[in-house]
């Protein structure tokens, strides 16, 4: 549901514009799995055909992707190529400090950080661009030495607030509880 509500819908509304970017910090799944899940949703919405990401990989026991389904996947290639342009996925382990450093590096591709006499500011290359920063999910952040899990989450939240205020990004933080 998170993928559909917070990623897929905004993505589809903006996929053909240069004014939209998603930086996805995927602590729960690899980039390939994320893209395949998005492709599965896209195929359902576009073709009315349900093909799970495991079926797309032919990893479901006793299942082989049919020629018809393979043709559908091939027809989705332009969409997948555009998806890779719009969504940048970081799928390695992270702590709050590493997250902040990575986001500063990524945001430098879309603008510049400049020092004024009183503070550091961000000047976007395209002021109309919306950048979603998705952290999925925050409980999987690694603790840095000397910090508790709560302190790590609090620090990551504070970093995201700083980036929201300085750079105008829209953070989406996913937290799951069992």
Model regions: which residues?
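Cytosolic-facing regulatory segments adjacent to core modules
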Residues: 12-128
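P-loop NTPase motor core
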Residues: 1-20, 26-27, 92-178
């Amino acid at each position: 549901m998170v993928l559909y509500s917070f990623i897929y819908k905004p993505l589809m509304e903006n996929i053909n514009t240069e004014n939209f970017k998603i930086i996805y910090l995927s602590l729960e799944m690899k980039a390939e799995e994320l893209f395949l899940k998005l492709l599965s949703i896209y195929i359902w919405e576009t073709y009315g055909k349900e093909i799970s990401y495991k079926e797309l990989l032919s990893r479901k026991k006793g299942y082989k992707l049919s020629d018809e389904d393979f043709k559908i996947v091939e027809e989705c290639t332009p969409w997948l190529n555009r998806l890779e342009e719009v969504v940048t996925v970081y799928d390695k382990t992270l702590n709050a400090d590493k997250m902040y450093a990575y986001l500063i590096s990524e945001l430098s591709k879309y603008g510049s950080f400049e020092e004024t006499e009183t503070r550091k500011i961000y000047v976007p290359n395209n002021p109309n661009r919306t950048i979603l920063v998705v952290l999925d999910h925050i409980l999987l952040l690694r603790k840095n030495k000397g910090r508790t899990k709560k302190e790590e989450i609090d620090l990551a939240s504070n970093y995201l607030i700083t980036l929201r205020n300085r750079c105008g990004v829209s953070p989406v933080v996913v937290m799951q509880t069992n």
